[in-house]
Amino acid sequence: MSDRLKPLIGTAATRPLSREEAEFAFECLFEGEATPAQMGGLLMALRTRGETVDEYAAAASVMRAKCHKVRAPNGAIDIVGTGGDGKGTLNISTATAFVVAGAGVPVAKHGNRNLSSKSGAADALTEMGLNVMIGPEQVEACLMEAGIGFMMAPMHHPAMRHVGPVRAELGTRTIFNILGPLTNPAGVKRQLTGAFSPDLIRPMAEVLSALGSEKAWLVHGGDGTDELAISAASKVAALEGGQIREFELHPEEAGLPVHPFEEIVGGTPAENAQAFRALLDGAPGAYRDAVLLNAAAALVVADRAAHLREGVEIATDSILSGAAKAKVALLARLTNAA
């Protein structure tokens, strides 16, 4: 332990930290050079004042540098949300990942266990028979053979062990609640990323731009979810060519009907997995349409589709042809053989 972080705690409470100051601060956190009290003091100083893009980018860049990295195919995309929206929906981004992979786009998905629902990405995948507790080499093998891999956050970010207990004791949101989607161990350059607050989508797009992303959609559903909503219009901050464009997106623009929010509310991991299996078998309804909407957006971000309606067509074929279901079966086999 050292006192190197201490001077920056007071500074962080009164003014934004520069990129260099913030990088130094998070180096201290991730190297275990700060006491729990100092870590908590810094995190709450940042939260109370309000984190800046430079601070987000600094934390993400340090976290990326210290992670166990994964090599992914060119053009790989991450489909992920911050969690923390408190809505308890079915596993939309997880299902979307397999539909997109079934359409031929490599998906390097970063995730964790439940944050905003009874069943997070890792919970759902475990229930579907996948082994999520695998390391970088095994994930790389999955990406190369199946075109999809799941990176369980704790398996790739060992430096978080210093911060985890402090986050648990604080019991409130901190900068780390949005760092997951910004710190993909595969370093993908394309993202469909959901945020629990509409106020985060522009800053997160700016952070991804600063970190080298080529194309990304940062989204927040009008139903309060951290994904494109099927029950309301969604807010989008689209990054492309270093420029960020903000707009609202309605399901009908993709040729999809609006459904009541209640129709995508999830349950236990077992219940969500049952709904996921039905979706893969082609069951129509709100869940499938929500996945089609998000998959269409991901396909646009991946340049696999020129527009959302084409994306919906491609995603529908991925489901009805059995391609998405085959990806689940293949990934289950590969992860359990690891």
Curated annotation (Swiss-Prot):
Enzyme Commission no: 2.4.2.18
Residue positions binding 5-phospho-alpha-D-ribose 1-diphosphate: 81, 84-85, 89, 91-94, 109-117, 121
Gene3D superfamilies per record: Nucleoside phosphorylase/phosphoribosyltransferase catalytic domain, Transferase, Pyrimidine Nucleoside Phosphorylase, Chain C
Source taxonomy: Bacteria, Pseudomonadati, Pseudomonadota, Alphaproteobacteria, Rhodobacterales
Family: Belongs to the anthranilate phosphoribosyltransferase family.
GO CC annotations, alphabetized: cytosol
Annotated protein name in UniProt: Anthranilate phosphoribosyltransferase
Record's function text: Catalyzes the transfer of the phosphoribosyl group of 5-phosphorylribose-1-pyrophosphate (PRPP) to anthranilate to yield N-(5'-phosphoribosyl)-anthranilate (PRA).
SUPFAM superfamilies in the record: Nucleoside phosphorylase/phosphoribosyltransferase catalytic domain, Nucleoside phosphorylase/phosphoribosyltransferase N-terminal domain
Source species, domain of life: Bacteria
Pfam families (alphabetical): Glycos_trans_3N, Glycos_transf_3
InterPro entries: Anthranilate_Pribosyl_Tfrase, Glycosyl_Trfase_fam3, Glycosyl_Trfase_fam3_N_dom, Glycosyl_Trfase_fam3_N_dom_sf, Nuc_phospho_transferase
Residues given in the record as Mg(2+) 1 binding sites: S93, E227
Binding-site positions, anthranilate 1: G81, N112
Binding residues annotated for Mg(2+) 2, in chain numbering: D226, E227
Catalyzed reactions per annotation: N-(5-phospho-beta-D-ribosyl)anthranilate + diphosphate = 5-phospho-alpha-D-ribose 1-diphosphate + anthranilate
Enzyme class at the top of the EC tree: transferase
